[in-house]
Amino acid sequence: LCVGMHRTNQFTECDGMLGNNSNLVPGAAGDTSGSLYPRRGIKNIIMADGPAGLRLQPVFKTDKQGNLLPGGEMIGGYPAAFNSSYTNENSDTYYQYCTSIPIGWSLAQSWSPELLESVGTLIGREMAAFGVDLWLAPALNIHRNPLCGRNFEYYSEDPLISGKCAAAITRGVQSCSGKGVTIKHFAANSQEDNRYFSNSH
């Protein structure tokens, strides 16, 4: 887990920090600082959320200098409108439509590790195409409580099936050079009481 605060006296630029949206890949969950690249050769890491494939902003615009323009962000399930002053003459429009894959428990019902591995490979290739380094998935929690609002993300109530599914999709993603997963929600994410004041990360 990367946490921290940018110090202006230590670095010469202020890139996105974990928890903010990425300015490098619109709609990505966040990115780490690229400030160490000039001195140490350490690239920043761009992370995109799951769980049904990559979750990125499908449409975005930049000005002619390449600066991201506001609009297109998902707000309340709908994309925010672009300012009508953005025309083809003063802005460029980009599209990054990602494949929507079935959710975890649907994939687990296939009983096919080969299928899950091929789905992982598809996700890894899309990560490469859109410049994403880490996929914030798969979700490996088990179905402990039928009232859990996030059971759809998890593979099964059976830990063996869940582990086999997560391993297969991980193999697929990581078969693509430089791409990785962040298996998450090992425990306590199924708690519905006091949900907004607990931390399962």
Label each region the model flagged.
Residues 1-201:
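Glycoside hydrolase catalytic-domain context in secreted enzymes
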